[in-house]
Amino acid sequence: MAEALAVESCSRCNFPSVIHQAYSGQHLCGRHLFASIRKRTSKELRQQLRLPKDARHEDGSPYRILVAISGGKDSAVLLTMMHDIIGNRRDVELISGCIDEGIDGYRAPSLECARQLAESLDVRFETLSYEEMGYERMDEVVTRIPVIGENHDEAKGLMPCSYCGVFRRQGLNALARKVNADVMALGHNLDDMAQSILMNLQRGEIDRSVRLAPHTEDPIDGVAPRIVPLRWIPEQEIHAHAICQGLPMYHGDCPHAPGAMRQQSRGIVADMESITPGARHGLLHSLDEIRRLHREANQDSKSEVNNCLECGEITSREVCQACTMKQWLTETS
């Protein structure tokens, strides 16, 4: 008869652990994992939001936070944590929002998970689709990418995620305006942050890393600043917590994601962490230090931003990337 597998006890109590934090050496049960995630999330919210005791506007309306959710584990944990930490404040309103990219077999079930979660917390839920924004559905965009790459040098080598990422950012900006959000919360976890930093290093684009959220210390007029309360929480811990809490979440992967640069960086970051526990934290600490030095060196200068000549969105170009891509798609229709 096979012997039962031994399960480590929680480092803080005698209950069975559900996760091992290799970077800290601790084993945590579900209850203490929740406490650990909540503590780190609460600290980030205090640092990134810095809300006064009464955050209401002069007209009496509440301070509105748009929580971008997708139906996945990260945004599910983000919304529940924010609801637990600041959901009882009468001067703050949490609004959840989801972008429908138009991906058959993927977005519909994940959208339903997002809706179920918002309803269970009694949080307002809003959606916005690419079609409502005047863009093509992503399933249609994907079919035209090869031709666009042949016709435009700037488009050569771009993957579906390149288009979707640009359109999603525009969609979230539009959703933030729709609900009059003061700030937008994104569910990026520690692995996401480390992957982004690594990708930008690979491309020699340190400036892109400097511009990563949170943005509350460097706001841009006309755009709701992004905050990332889960940025110090590893993906594995978020997943374990979501399972322990029984949160509604969609487990499927986007069918258009394979081949994206982030998929490669995901494996590299995982290998780094396996060899050197704490490597992800080191990458993010390095970015924070680079950001601090950049801010000190550029105290008297402001980032140059323009309004897109086509749509009016904030951009560093004359015509924003979203409108450029939209034009490429129009040419191939």
Q: Language model features by range: what are they?
A:
Residues 1-67, 95, 208-333:
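ATP/NTP-dependent adenylation/nucleotidyl-transfer catalytic domains that generate, transfer
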Residues 2-211, 235-244, 320:
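ATP-dependent adenylation/nucleotidyltransferase module used to activate substrates
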